[in-house]
């Protein structure tokens, strides 16, 4: 049986945490900030944790990380 391959596009965007969760950067942060409030821009900084239902789907793609 062939080896499982890691989905490289996903591997560049997500990091696995020690407890098996996945974190990623926030979306909507590359441009068009003039339409966002200060609060929205502040809350978009940093990383986000993926919810548990989505983690199950992505865990298969990121099995070797």
Curated annotation (Swiss-Prot):
One of its GO terms (molecular function) is structural constituent of ribosome. One of its GO terms (cellular component) is cytosolic large ribosomal subunit. Keywords: Ribonucleoprotein, Ribosomal protein. Residues 1-47 are annotated as: Disordered. The keyword Cell inner membrane does not apply. One of its GO terms (biological process) is translation. The keyword Phosphoprotein does not apply. InterPro entries: Ribosomal_bL35, Ribosomal_bL35-like, Ribosomal_bL35_CS, Ribosomal_bL35_sf. Residues 1-16, 31-45 have a biased composition (Basic residues). Belongs to the bacterial ribosomal protein bL35 family. NCBIfam families: rpmI_bact (TIGR00001). HAMAP family: Ribosomal_bL35. This is Large ribosomal subunit protein bL35. It comes from Leuconostoc citreum (strain KM20).
